[in-house]
Amino acid sequence: MSSTTAFGIDIGGSGIKGAPVDLKAGELATDRLRIPTPQPSTPDAVAETVRELIESFDIAAGVPVGVPFPAVIQHGVAKTAANVDHSWIGTDVDALFTERTGHDVFVVNDADAAGIAEMEFGAGRDAKGVVLMTTLGTGVGTALFVDGHLVPNTELGHIPLHGDSAEKYMAESVREREELDWSQWAERLQEYYSLIEFLFNPDLIIVGGGVSKHHKKYLPELDLRAPIVPAELRNEAGIIGAAVLARHAEDETRAAAGGNGRKKSGLAADKAQAKLEKSAKKGDKKADKKARKNDKKAEKKTEKNSAKKSTSKD
């Protein structure tokens, strides 16, 4: 596969989907494959499923993998966990998947991945200024962009509204649970997006998630300063966006390594080796300290014995 290809894997609570992505066209290069998410969805079990999924495709060794993940991700580490086992919190997801699959893996918050796809190939591709992508589903995911640059992990579905997290008041799952009609739901969306406008003054708002296919039933009822439009890539957005991120990150990693083709996994190995060497040096220092302490004790003992002998002679 060429440098215009990367692999995307979308990890959800019930299914793990993946496919190679054509980064020129901004679409899946083949049909995607779906494997049920293992239960419990522990790091080890999910990593094994990700490996199986990748091996189901003819993926060249140098092709990077992007993974949208339902969590706040900082420097590859999961800080939260939604719809997956809580044992993910504190896990270095990048390192785990890279080690398990043999590919360089780059993990990103799932809403951020969808936003990246829309900014590259969808509703936000010509947008300037502040753009907010929202995904309406079980909860509310958000991705914020300023002049095309992602502000990661915004989690604006959790801003307070009516004394609780906003998503508990206006997510699509709430519409279904409370059996709200489209107009009733639009009233709640109006409250949420009005608050978002007050805080961020976006130039464009993009609405994604499965319910975006019904956008004509509720978006025209919203009265906002900013244009609000449906997402274009829908269910493929996460896979495509993560693949875009993976290819960009891989190219940056290679450039930072001096263009010698050295991958993140190699750098990670160097890091691990450096850690071991540091640990060994620490151990050597402790041993030296102990030896010096013993030498001092022996020296004091010798001086004491010499003093006794001298007194005895006198």
PLM features per residue range, with description:
Residues F69-A71, G137-V140, V211:
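Glycine-rich beta-alpha junction loops
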Residues A111-G115:
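Active-site-adjacent loop/helix segments that line or gate small-molecule/cofactor pockets in enzymes
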Residues V63, V67, V105-D110:
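General beta-strand structural signal in soluble alpha/beta enzymes
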Residues M1-P64, I73-V77, V93-H103, A117-L132, ...:
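ATP-binding/phosphotransfer module of carbohydrate and carboxylate kinases, centering on a glycine-rich
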Residues N83-V84, N109, N235:
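Asparagine-centered polar/low-complexity signal
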Residues A78-G90:
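A charged helix-plus-loop insertion that forms the helical arch/lid used to bind
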Residues D110, G137, A242:
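Active-site glycine-centered loops adjacent to acidic/histidine catalytic or metal-binding residues
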